């Protein structure tokens, strides 16, 4: 099972505050553990929402709103994508994360859908999705 581990933004991350060297070292050590355990698929920190945009959908209409966005509790500051056996294992890993912002922090864990979760998808569509995923993984492996 794949899980997205979402580091929630706060006022400091939205202000663009940089982690200290000690915080960076602690996070690097944690990421190293994930890699050595063979569970890390991806992981990145994100710039503040002031460097982003939102696209709102209403039928065929698209509306773009540039950041920053006011509600920091709805924003994310970073993520990991992990391959694990269960939600319980994901929780155990997340409990070991160094505090990502050095103060009040929150991390959300969400299971990622697989093609098997979509009962209305035809076999042809599932096969096409697998081919696209294989192509994506091959490109990622090339660096």
What are these model-predicted stretches?
Residues 1-143:
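Conserved, structured core segments of small domains
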